[in-house]
Amino acid sequence: TGRGPLVDEHALVKALREGALHGAGLDVFEFGDYPLPELLEMDNVVLTPHIGTQTMETRIIMARTVCNNVIGFLEGDRPVSRVLRP
């Protein structure tokens, strides 16, 4: 799991066509809001808008993680989750 730029969509299309991967599911895309057109045409690909965290359970976990990061920072600890700049 990761943000869109972590996935090379051209390589993904190639791997799916050659059978190296049997399927893929994406809710973020390499080049912003839209996936490569080839991915839209493939039966073994599921694409959704960026809604992977739209459950109450996930949002509670995210809120707790933020709180733990802030508390850890204030106490001089390493954050639970680090933000890396590209």
Regions found by a protein language model. Give the residues of each.
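Rossmann-like dinucleotide-binding domain for NAD(H)/NADP(H)
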Residues: 1-86
